[in-house]
C-alpha cells in the first residue's frame, strides 16, 4: 500500500525542504490540494528537490481550466520529474464552479470524461501520433502548429486520475482514467457496496485491468503518538464529517447506513448559520464509520482493516496545513500492507 502526504502550499519557499524531508521519511507521494492555493506551482518546486517521490495534484479543479492548460502543466512537470507525475482532477460542485470560478455548469460526469479524453488527445498529438482533432460536446481542439508543441518527454505523459463519489463518476474513472481519488467522506460499506461494483463496470467498458488502476483514499485517518493526540484528531474528523454530511452531493454515502435524516438536519443547520454546532450531531459511532482511528502503535492493523482489499494508497495527512508526522518505521509498516495495484499502464 502506498502512503501519501501533503506539503505546505502557503509559501513556495518552504517546499524544497518539506519535499526532501517527505521523501527521506519514506512516503510514496506528496499531494497538493486546490483550496486556498494553486496546486501545480508547489509540485514544480518539489520536482527540483526530489528524485523518487510521486508528485500528485489531489485535486486540481478541472472545469476552471482548459484541458490545454492542464496538458501543458502536466507535460512540463513530467519533463522535470519523469514518470513521477499524477494529475488528479475533480469537478467540484455547481456553486463553486458558477460562483467561485465563474464557469458554466453542466452534468459533471460526462463532461469530465470528455475532459480526460481531450487531455489524452492533446498528449497523443505532442507524441507524434497524428494531428490534433478532438471534437466533443464541451471541448474542441483542432489547432496545433509546431511552434506550440513542447519538447518530447523521455517517457509517457502523466497518469490521470479523477475524484469520484457517486456511481456515474466512479464509472467514468474506471473507464477512461488511470485511477480514482476517493473522497475521505467514505465508509467501508460504501467502498464495498458502491465503489467496487461501479469501478468494475467502468473497467469493463474501458477494457482496463484492475492491477493497472490505482484506488486512493476512501476515508479519514485519525492518529497520533498517544491517546490525547488521537482524541484531538478525532475532533477534527468529527467536524469534517459534519461539514461534508451537510452537502447533498455526499448523501449517497449516508444512504448506505440509513443516515439520510442526519444529512438533511445538518444541511438545515448550515443554511441557518449554525456551523459551530454541526459537529455535535456526529456521534463516535459515525466517526468510526468514516475514519481509521488509533495510536501509531495500532495504526497498521487499523488501516488494514479499514482500507485493505480496496484502497491501494492512503492519505496520511488531513490537510495541507497539517502534514503527516508518522514515524518512518510506521510508514514502512503501512507500505507492507498488500494492495492490488502494480503500476500504471504505459
Task: Give, region by region, the residue ranges found by the protein language model.
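Active-site-adjacent structural elements that line small-molecule/cofactor binding pockets in enzymes
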Residues: 1-346
Amino acid at each position: 500500500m502506498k502512503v501519501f502526504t501533503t506539503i505546505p502550499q502557503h509559501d513556495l519557499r518552504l517546499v524544497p525542504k518539506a519535499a526532501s524531508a517527505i521523501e527521506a521519511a519514506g512516503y510514496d507521494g506528496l499531494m497538493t490540494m486546490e483550496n486556498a492555493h494553486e496546486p501545480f506551482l508547489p509540485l514544480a518546486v518539489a520536482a527540483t528537490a526530489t528524485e523518487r517521490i510521486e508528485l500528485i495534484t489531489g485535486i486540481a479543479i478541472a472545469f476552471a481550466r482548459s484541458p490545454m492548460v492542464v496538458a501543458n502543466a502536466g507535460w512540463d512537470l513530467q519533463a522535470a520529474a519523469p514518470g513521477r507525475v499524477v494529475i488528479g482532477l475533480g469537478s467540484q460542485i455547481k456553486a463553486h464552479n458558477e460562483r467561485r470560478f465563474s464557469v458554466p455548469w453542466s452534468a459533471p460526469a460526462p463532461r469530465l470524461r470528455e475532459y480526460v479524453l481531450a487531455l489524452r488527445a492533446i498528449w497523443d498529438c505532442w507524441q507524434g501520433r497524428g494531428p490534433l482533432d478532438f471534437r466533443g460536446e464541451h471541448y474542441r481542439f483542432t489547432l496545433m502548429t509546431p511552434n506550440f508543441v513542447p519538447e518530447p518527454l523521455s517517457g509517457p505523459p502523466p497518469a490521470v486520475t479523477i475524484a469520484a463519489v457517486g456511481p456515474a463518476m466512479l464509472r467514468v474513472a474506471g473507464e477512461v482514467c488511470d485511477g480514482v481519488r476517493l473522497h475521505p467522506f467514505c465508509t467501508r460499506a460504501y467502498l464495498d457496496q458502491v465503489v467496487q461494483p461501479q469501478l468494475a463496470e467502468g473497467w469493463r467498458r474501458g477494457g482496463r485491468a484492475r492491477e493497472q488502476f490505482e484506488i486512493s483514499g476512501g476515508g479519514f485517518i485519525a492518529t497520533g503518538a498517544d491517546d490525547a493526540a488521537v482524541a484531538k484528531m478525532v475532533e477534527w474528523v468529527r467536524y469534517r464529517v459534519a461539514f461534508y454530511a451537510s452537502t447533498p452531493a455526499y448523501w449517497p454515502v449516508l444512504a448506505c447506513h440509513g443516515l439520510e435524516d442526519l444529512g438533511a438536519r445538518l444541511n438545515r443547520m448550515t443554511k441557518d448559520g449554525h456551523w459551530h454546532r454541526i459537529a455535535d450531531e456526529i456521534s463516535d459511532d459515525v466517526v468510526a464509520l468514516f475514519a481509521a482511528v488509533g495510536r501509531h502503535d495500532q495504526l497498521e492493523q487499523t488501516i488494514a482493516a479499514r482500507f485493505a482489499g480496496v484502497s491501494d494508497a492512503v492519505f496520511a495527512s488531513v490537510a495541507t496545513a497539517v502534514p503527516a508526522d508518522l514515524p518512518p518505521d510506521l510508514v514502512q509498516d503501512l507500505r507492507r500492507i498488500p494492495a492490488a495495484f502494480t503500476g500504471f499502464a504505459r
